[in-house]
Amino acid sequence: MYKVLIVEDDPMVAMINEQFVSRHKDFTVSNKCSDGKSALEYLEDNDVDLIILDVYMPYMDGFETLRQIRKKQIPVDVIMVTAANEREQLKEGLHLGVVDYLIKPFTFERFKMALDKFITQAEALKDLERVNQKTLIF
């Protein structure tokens, strides 16, 4: 089961995201944080597989949070959530290695597609690691 951290400053959206994650059999919510700073603090002591990360938050926006995650070399995948469908934001997120973008408002089906995309990429990476290990043995 994949562990998910939800980082969202709007309590209602955080609750909806938690419900959407819980509806997917392969995921569990490990924690919710209301801003990037508290998310970084949580990640210091806890491992998660995926972060659902809002772009617009107080104190530290989602992009700065993601830059700090990458700088600290925390091995985690990220799905960004934003209310704005701006090309520059999308490019910046892709440059920082996000798995997918969710543009508010989104449906459960769209949310599930993003989670399934994460699973596909995570499983492909595991397969690649297994192949590399077998190659090293021979």
What residue spans do the PLM features occupy?
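A Lys-centered signature of the CheY-like receiver
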Residues: 104
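Helix N-cap/capping motif at the beta->alpha junctions
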Residues: 32-41, 62-65
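Active-site beta3 strand of CheY-like receiver
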Residues: 46-52
